[in-house]
Amino acid sequence: MVRATPIHRYRNIGIMAHIDAGKTTTSERILFYAGVCHQMGEVHDGAAVMDWMEQEQERGITITSAATTVFWSGMDKSMPQHRFNIIDTPGHVDFTIEVERSLRVLDGAVFVLCAVGGVQPQSETVWRQANKYFVPRMAFVNKMDRTGANFDKVVEQLKARLGAYPVPMQVPIGAEDGFEGVIDLLKMKAIHWDAASQGTVFEYRDIPIELVDKASKARAFMVEAAAEATEELMDKYLNEGELKEQEILQGLRERTLKVEIIPVFCGSAFKNKGVQAMLDGVIHLLPSPADRPPVQGLDEKGNECRCKASDSEPFSALAFKIMTDPFVGSLTFFRVYSGVLNSGDQVYNSVKLKKERVGRILQMHSNQRDEIKEVRAGDIAAAVGLKDVTTGDTLCDQNHIITLERMIFPEPVISMAVEPKTKSDQEKMGMALGRLAQEDPSFRVKTDEESGQTIISGMGELHLDIIVDRMRREFNVEANVGKPQVAYRETIRKSDVKSDYKHVKQSGGKGQYGHVVIEISPMSDVDKQHPDVKGDFLFINEITGGVIPKEFISPIEKGLRETITSGPLAGFPVVGVKVKLVFGSYHDVDSSEMAFKLAASMAFKQGFAKANPVLLEPIMKVEIVSPEDYLGDIMGDVSRRRGVLQGQDDSLSGKVINAMIPLGEMFGYATSLRSMTQGRATFAMEFDHYEEAPANIADTVIKKT
């Protein structure tokens, strides 16, 4: 089958932003103008197409990344048809995992900002994630019709707070109630959209006299930014003082693809102004899969190899999301980097080392689905029938094996106990939690060995609330939920602590014998770079002369690794520890894997107790935005919560207070901040680092366990 859309006309893009920037409304307008929806859904009505989960429609926030495909031929229909695969990502900090895995498979992004609120805490988090994956992006300053809208100030904030190099492509005509349209700096014409046609009809007009000077200056800045792309363009610009429209676009595109500049558009998605021109910008300025560097991976022998975005290359794809669909079961969302895949084909999972057959391939439109026969390089689709795939797995041609770089997901920072309300809920709950954990790598489930309770862990209170809510709605499981608990960690402060343990049992017949001598130390920065570090723990075997036979070394390491999952201090995971196996002995008859495993575990527990063990608590980076009147109260409250103030900034919506606060002090903070400021302040927090808990806090936590 011939490819319907050439790969250079593909755009795999994400719509990214903080909460309330109008991201989902912007996505809805894209669907409307591209002809996918014949009626617009509004977030505040709970009718947005991209927000398809019940909780999303109720809460008015996007939780999971909905994927959809649309086609665009330009605002004036003059361009060849381009295919946009769009992912709408959540803006709440508890769901940054969704943003992270979307960015991993996208080629470009549209960064939606609120013209009133400007750059918010979540904007910074998302920006850092986009930098990590070197994603070219452009900005859309939305809500230009709102009271307090200020385009220039937002552009300034992009520079000051995100370290970006923004290049405005437009100048707004008016603001707030007087927002009429935009000036296109390429054509030096004003664009006015017709309200009666919901923005589908537009016209070019002359630039209003009072804005000619401002537009000329902005255009000169844009042309200069384009000229800096190459020496050839710069020479032409210096000699002629101007560049042609095509040359400007060429220069800007080149610099956008290198993530040197951020082209900035503006409008009001709600008032149907500006999204249309921004879509033209996606075609002109964001990359196709063929413009991105070939994706890197490792072959069977561990050598580095690359996949070019071409149909003629062997098939390779990355599974970036697993979802449970009520009608078809498990859906695996994947991005094809190279080659072609037909429904019914076999794929090789190079992470699990397994072959699987792809049943059906679906093109997703939010939670609607169309069955398709094949996918090609650059496509994003969902597969039905893959049984043993998890997020981050590579799917490839079994004759050309490659493992693409895996995604690294953050460790959960908050836990709570859940128990089924009735016996019939018991079995269903296990299945539901298993499915949800498969979908979301930042959500973990475990059973507390002592109490037998099921413990769920995630990235924040809202994250776990929604998990419990989904259990009830999608799996019909009613559960009681305990209080949120902090995910503490344990470590040591003393170095080179020796621990000698001999496990001996003799009770007639074959006995048990295992003897190990270990040295325990905190991991240094050099240790952290050691190739054998796994999960913040380093095991080094220094046995010589066969005092412990080789076959018992692996059980010793296994015994240590099992022990560190529940530390001796208070049962929390142990981190940042190095263990050297330095000596031991064995018995020809009585030694076994189990005996050495037990000896290693006991040696570690004894050594850990002597190595000055400490409890670590998660510290959150908190940003509070508030009117100035409440600053004193808020700062006093931060101090009472053992917070450390990091400084203040000005924002378009008030003062910004930055602080580091222990997670244990942040439960219920939303309610307390609301009552302190009459609901006028907002906050966002994300995990920053672990640090030693004060003795009184550590004692309380240890006594509870």
Swiss-Prot record:
Key words, A-Z: Cytoplasm, Elongation factor, GTP-binding, Nucleotide-binding, Protein biosynthesis
InterPro entries found in the cross-reference section: EFG_II (IPR041095), EFG_III (IPR009022), EFG_III/V (IPR035647), EFG_IV (IPR047872), EFG_V (IPR035649), EFG_V-like (IPR000640), EFTu-like_2 (IPR004161), G_TR_CS (IPR031157)
Gene Ontology CC terms, in alphabetical order: cytoplasm
Pfam families, sorted: EFG_C, EFG_III, EFG_IV, GTP_EFTU, GTP_EFTU_D2
Sites where the protein binds GTP: 17-24, 88-92, 142-145
UniProt subcellular location: Cytoplasm
Protein's job: Catalyzes the GTP-dependent ribosomal translocation step during translation elongation. During this step, the ribosome changes from the pre-translocational (PRE) to the post-translocational (POST) state as the newly formed A-site-bound peptidyl-tRNA and P-site-bound deacylated tRNA move to the P and E sites, respectively. Catalyzes the coordinated movement of the two tRNA molecules, the mRNA and conformational changes in the ribosome.
Protein name: Elongation factor G
Source taxonomy: Bacteria, Pseudomonadati, Pseudomonadota, Gammaproteobacteria, Lysobacterales
